[in-house]
């Protein structure tokens, strides 16, 4: 018999026993991965369908021809047309796509008996690392905020979250309420407090959606939508990072799990060649993995300097000072400083940061006198105070130092979509809209 149905049961851990039963007791003939958009009358992009053909009983002699056996073991034939976007394109590719063959009995040897067209061989990442489940407080709107909305970091703890692209450091914009050691969450049956065993340990954070972007993990509490992969041997972490940050990692995971959001257990059930990736790590990171750095002001590790820059230097194989920034965040950071805001990295001398990142944090001390004492800055001059635009101009000049010029100001206004105009009109017309992005 043949049937079209969602593909998830071929690889989800919860269907392991069901797969084992069918693989042992029935004969599988053909699996066609149709993917999203396989039917002209169904527009959904989330449901990924398969066409599967099988028969009762597990006799390797029952089929012949295309669905024949090899070495007395039944072969499952597989065709993958999941990549084309339209039903017409999929139909055309069905006629030309490669037909793969895998032994049915060998599927039982795959992790969790997952059904895959490609052979899963070699040692798994799970031999060297664990994929750890995250937590949520059952009420994100009540217990989870952006860090810049909070001032008391004794009861609000930094909370590692998902990120959109692979980068050394990302997903560091949230805090999570954790008064009395998280008592309100531990007492709440709807909340999930997970991952305590890896808090404080370094690792690799995988966002569990789409192309599985990764970032380095610094040991913070973490969201249920991302999974830290924690090396059992810290010496293996650079190799694991190099593997997980490569395209090969996403491809390996997707060979065994095509679900939109994968599970934490799946993330370490892929082949991992420790020797190979150790060599890659020695070449890419001879001085070790970087300490936290970023020029993104939405991250709690941001140095707080309006124009300071820290980059990864491929030649040096380490962090380094970059060129002074003139991007669209510079004016926003400068206004925040003018109003008296300071980043968490400035307030925590013990926060782990790259040396260059800490240098920029220290340089922010020279900008403190430019901050308003009461946090209220009027655009026009009021009661003897200088206008907001002039005060902002003075702060920027101090931040850039000898590099400051009218050309820098012009570049900043251009980056803020306000080319050829003034700081005052930017404050009046553009600042708030851009601040709320």
Question: What residue spans do the PLM features occupy?
Answer:
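Terminal accessory regions of large proteins
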Residues: 195, 283, 287-437
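Polyanion-binding catalytic cores of nucleic-acid enzymes and NTP/SAM-utilizing transferases
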Residues: 100-232, 268, 280-296, 300-327, ...
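Glycine-rich, acidic and aromatic/proline-enriched surface loops and short helix-turn segments
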Residues: 243-250
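Extended accessory and catalytic-adjacent subdomains in large enzymes
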Residues: 270-272
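Alpha-helix initiation/capping motif
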Residues: 103-104, 201, 263, 354, ...
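General secondary-structure edge motif
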Residues: 2, 32, 186, 209, ...
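Signature of N6-adenine DNA methyltransferases within the class I
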Residues: 1-155, 168, 218-227, 234-238, ...
């Amino acid at each position: 018999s043949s049937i079209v149905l969602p593909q998830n049961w071929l690889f989800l851990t919860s269907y392991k026993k069901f797969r084992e039963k069918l693989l042992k007791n029935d004969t599988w003939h053909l699996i066609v991965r149709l993917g999203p958009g396989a039917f002209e009358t169904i527009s959904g992009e989330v449901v990924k369908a398969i066409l599967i053909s099988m028969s009762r009983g597990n006799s390797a002699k029952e089929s012949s021809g295309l669905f024949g056996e090899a070495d007395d073991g039944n072969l499952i034939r597989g065709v993958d047309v999941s990549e084309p976007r339209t039903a017409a394109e999929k139909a055309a590719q069905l006629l030309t796509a490669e037909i793969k063959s895998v032994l049915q009995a060998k599927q039982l040897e795959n992790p969790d008996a997952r059904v895959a067209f490609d052979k899963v061989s070699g040692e798994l990442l799970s031999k060297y690392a664990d994929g750890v489940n995250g937590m949520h407080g059952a009420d994100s709107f009540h217990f989870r905020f952006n860090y810049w909305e909070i001032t008391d970091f004794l009861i609000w703890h930094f909370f590692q979250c998902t990120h959109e692209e692979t980068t050394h450091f990302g997903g560091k914009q949230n805090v999570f309420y954790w008064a009395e050691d998280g008592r309100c969450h531990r007492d709440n049956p709807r909340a999930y407090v997970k991952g305590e065993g890896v808090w404080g340990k370094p690792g690799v954070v995988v966002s569990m959606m789409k192309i599985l972007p990764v970032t380095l993990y610094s040991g913070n509490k973490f969201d249920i939508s991302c999974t830290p992969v924690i090396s059992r041997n810290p010496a293996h972490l650079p190799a694991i990072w190099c593997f997980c940050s490569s395209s090969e990692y996403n491809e390996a995971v997707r060979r065994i799990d095509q679900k939109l959001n994968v599970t934490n257990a799946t993330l370490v059930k892929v082949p991992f060649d420790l020797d190979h990736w150790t060599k890659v790590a020695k070449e890419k990171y001879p001085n070790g993995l970087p300490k936290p750095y970023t020029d993104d002001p939405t991250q709690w590790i941001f140095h707080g300097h309006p124009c300071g820059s820290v980059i990864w230097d491929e030649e040096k194989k380490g962090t380094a000072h970059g060129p002074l920034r003139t991007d669209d965040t510079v004016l926003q950071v400068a206004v925040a400083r003018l109003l008296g805001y300071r980043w968490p990295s400035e307030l925590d001398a013990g926060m782990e940061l790259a040396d260059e990142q800490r240098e920029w944090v220290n340089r922010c001390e020279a900008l403190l006198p430019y901050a308003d004492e009461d946090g209220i800055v009027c655009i026009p001059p009021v009661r003897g105070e200088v206008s907001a635009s002039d005060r902002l101009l003075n702060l920027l000049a101090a931040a850039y130092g000898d590099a400051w010029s009218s050309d820098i100001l012009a570049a900043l206004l251009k980056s803020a979509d306000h080319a050829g105009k003034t700081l005052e009109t930017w404050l009046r017309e553009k600042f708030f809209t851009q601040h709320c992005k």
